């Protein structure tokens, strides 16, 4: 098993519901360490750059609009198989299809306002972590 880092974003809908602590408790209960964290209100440019991979998709504008609608909580998580573990904790993208007890089943309202983002692979995790935490802001514990 490998120690990995992954990026997690608690999206504006979940921040507004005041469930950051409950989501953090799930990360920690699953053995994931929060090695960097910050709350920010993304600019449109930052959101467009971060989600550039989806630029040609029909949902891109709505995704960007949603991500700039309020503050987000961004964290780098570290642990054994952190990427898969975080994706399991999040549940399916559509909260109606997410397993009971997952973050999205418990806190998300729709496929758009789906509470959290998580890196989907090691390559994207590395790019996403460095996008929000360039260099010295990530601390191994």
From Swiss-Prot:
Which catalytic reaction applies to this protein? Answer: a 2'-deoxyribonucleoside 5'-diphosphate + ATP = a 2'-deoxyribonucleoside 5'-triphosphate + ADP; a ribonucleoside 5'-diphosphate + ATP = a ribonucleoside 5'-triphosphate + ADP
Q: Name one GO molecular function term.
A: ATP binding
Q: Mostly located where?
A: cytoplasm
Against Gene3D superfamilies, the record matches this protein to: Nucleoside diphosphate kinase-like domain (3.30.70.141)
Catalytic site positions: 117 (pros-phosphohistidine intermediate)
* SUPFAM superfamilies (alphabetical): Nucleoside diphosphate kinase, NDK
Recorded hits in HAMAP family, A to Z, give: NDP_kinase
Q: Where in the cell is it found?
A: Cytoplasm
Could you name the Gene Ontology cellular component terms for this entry? cytoplasm
The residue range of the signal peptide is none
Which domain of life, per UniProt?
Bacteria
Give the E.C. number(s). 2.7.4.6
Q: Which gene encodes it?
A: ndk
Swiss-Prot/TrEMBL keywords:
ATP-binding, Cytoplasm, Kinase, Magnesium, Metal-binding, Nucleotide metabolism, Nucleotide-binding, Phosphoprotein, Transferase
EC class, as a word, reads transferase
According to its UniProt record, which protein family does this protein belong to? Answer: Belongs to the NDK family.
- Note the Pfam families from the entry: NDK
The answer, when asked if Magnesium is one of the entry's keywords, is: yes
Q: Which residues bind ATP?
A: 11, 59, 87, 93, 104, 114
Q: Which cofactor does it need?
A: Mg(2+)
Tell me how this protein assembles. Answer: Homotetramer.
Tell me what this protein is called: Nucleoside diphosphate kinase
What does the protein in this record do? Major role in the synthesis of nucleoside triphosphates other than ATP. The ATP gamma phosphate is transferred to the NDP beta phosphate via a ping-pong mechanism, using a phosphorylated active-site intermediate.
